[in-house]
Amino acid sequence: MIEPLLLGIVLGLIPITLAGLFVAAYLQYKRGNQLNLE
């Protein structure tokens, strides 16, 4: 049986990790476009 605390931590970290990767990819994509335009 999985501990509720561990399960809560995992469920809490997954959205944060996905959000962090999305923001990082967006910033890199935006930065790349700015460099290409210049």
From Swiss-Prot:
Check the record and name the Pfam families matching this protein: PetG
Gene Ontology MF: a single term: electron transporter, transferring electrons within cytochrome b6/f complex of photosystem II activity
Q: Does the keyword Electron transport apply?
A: yes
Q: Which domain of life is it from?
A: Bacteria
Q: Any idea which UniProt keywords this protein has?
A: Electron transport, Membrane, Photosynthesis, Thylakoid, Transmembrane, Transmembrane helix, Transport
Compartments, as annotated in UniProt? Cellular thylakoid membrane
> What binding partners and quaternary form does the record give?
The 4 large subunits of the cytochrome b6-f complex are cytochrome b6, subunit IV (17 kDa polypeptide, PetD), cytochrome f and the Rieske protein, while the 4 small subunits are PetG, PetL, PetM and PetN. The complex functions as a dimer.
Name the record gives this protein: Cytochrome b6-f complex subunit 5
Native species: Crocosphaera subtropica (strain ATCC 51142 / BH68)
Phylogenetic placement of the source organism: Bacteria, Bacillati, Cyanobacteriota, Cyanophyceae, Oscillatoriophycideae
Per the record, the gene is petG
